[in-house]
Amino acid sequence: MLIAKAVAVTLLAGSFGGLTASPSGDAAAYEKQTQLEAKRVACMTERGLDYLASPEPRYTWQPGEQERLAGDLEALRAYRAKYGFGVWSANVYPKDEVVNPVQHENPNNKMLMSLSAGELKKWRAADDSCFSQAVKEVLGKTVTSQEDYHNQLEAAVRKSLSVLDQDKRLVQLGGRFAACLGVSPAEPTALDGLSHTKIVRQASDVAKKAWKGEPPKAPKGKTVIFRPNLKPAHARPYLDKEIKAALKDLECGKDFYPAYSPKAMEITSRVYQEFGREGAAQAIPSRIYRTLV
């Protein structure tokens, strides 16, 4: 993650649909992740390179979180009344783990920082090769690198969620949702997260103005999103506007979310589990913020 004095930078992908809740298959998926990490260790050791297993820790749910992701209006309203969509609230409540969860630190970071540029390049090439081999052995999937793995995962999610755009009831509810928001008619998967995305982009515009020097260029097909690093008092007015937008979005989507979210939840979780990841724990951050630079 690239942290500047003003902002942190994030890549934004095109899909913003389908947040997930914790399904029974998560335990099996987590076991696959553990197996995959063990094989990476063995492969790197065979090549004479260091690697410490680094599975993501099991996800800890916040009170009301699963209900929100399943489209529960009361839980959504309680969250949005304080945090909005969770964008500016991260600045206003810097010590609140609801919007600033503790980040998993990769145990390999210290070792990687000690490598020269040439050694790091060699290590990353070997790691991608070992990762791809482990994915094939554990998941039966063919990938060429970790980036390719994540790209395939996101593509699989988008493809699987597209069935919801053919759901006549969701299309009808989505039409009313869009009309209430004052936006052009859109597919259900495009409506889920639409208002949230607007706030993310607005925050990015504010943060970009504070960027020192030449801003980073986005890889092809992605957009660079700047994350603000404002003090709570400076971020508060932005959060107030975000809360207003989030509550309006919920009022407009009061029929849409309870119908759409449970289906999107099940689909997204299933795909993530197929890729050896806890459905909810891994899918939640990926919907809006795709890959940290």
Q: Which residues are covered by each model-predicted region?
A:
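Secretory targeting and sorting signals
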Residues: 1-21
